[in-house]
Amino acid sequence: MELELEPITLPGVEDKRPMVIAGPCSAETEEQVMSTAKQLADKGLKLFRAGIWKPRTKPGGFEGVGVDGLAWLKEVKKETGMYVSTEVATAKHVYECLKAGIDLLWVGARTTANPFAVQEIADALKGVDIPVLVKNPVNPDLELWIGALERINNAGLKRLGAIHRGFSSYDKKLYRNLPQWHIPIELRRRIPNLPIICDPSHIGGKRELVAPLCQQVMDLGFNGLIIESHCNPDCAWSDAAQQVTPDVLDYILNLLVIRKETQSTENLSELRKQIDECDNNLIQELAKRMRVAREIGTYKKEHDMTILQTGRYNEILEKRGSQGALCGMDAEFIKKVFEAIHEESVRQQMEIINK
């Protein structure tokens, strides 16, 4: 389905990359909220964020100040002129935010993963004209992400955007949440006019990763950033390690290199022709490989052999990984390529054996 979309920009906010939404992970006290907001406003930022209700993985942690925090956001709006935003997870949250005059809402990752919860929020938003951003679900499921956007769009909301905050994983070596950039890139391909805002705070999980992730986001051509900024991050009641001060945030934003999204030159066109030729050759060679795989499938059927020959598969992965490394390619990338090729070969051989 095609989404009916309108710009999410708010009056007085310049329509340029990056759109920046900044503020603390959680609204903790009125003083903390106002101090952070005033410092961000002094840096020229126009969009303030703060979590009012905080869904935690386990009970017992700080779960937000609740409705009381909405009054603090109203005061931020009054004192600084900034637009204010927060996360909603239930219909009641939506009603309370609309009553308080919140300017922008977002749906969190845990909520996006639950179609029932998303539909409840969509129903509560019917007849309302407010920008809504939808975070990716915690698991890497593009269809679930798009489905949440469709539900809210079906409720009549056209000022929609997506937030990419990475995906949960047991592998925490570098990132708190794996970026898996191919997923938001595919979202951009599928819905080209949908703004994509990235959340380097949640992807990185550490403040030292915020700056490089911000630059990577801009280099990929995404629209904006939602960044956690706290007046005293080390004392934050939630996600302290990934928050930065307003001064540090200002420094990061001033260092960003914003490259042009579209500018085709003659040299670039020639290089793209070479890429197209390589891709054509790849497809021809893959088709040839699959024909041979089908012949092998026929042989296995005739000789009552199992499809999976583990020794041969391990040999292919090891040899191709070494060959790729000699050609300057990442061994893990080569492994993934040949895993995908092997999966398709097995599928085609299964068809032959089951005929």
Cite the ranges covered by each PLM segment.
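N-terminal amphipathic alpha-helix/helix-capping segment at the start of soluble metabolic enzymes
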Residues: 1-21, 75
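Catalytic alpha/beta core domains of metabolic enzymes, predominantly
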Residues: 13, 117-251, 255, 260-266
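Hydrophobic faces of well-ordered beta-strands that scaffold small-molecule active sites
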Residues: 18-24, 46-50, 84-86, 105-107, ...
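Active-site mouth loops of central-metabolism enzymes
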Residues: 18-35, 59-61, 82-88, 108-109, ...
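A structural motif
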Residues: 42-45, 102, 157, 222
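Catalytic beta/alpha-barrel core
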Residues: 65, 81-94, 103-118, 130-142, ...
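Domain-level signature for soluble enzymes in the chorismate/prephenate branch of the shikimate pathway
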Residues: 261-355
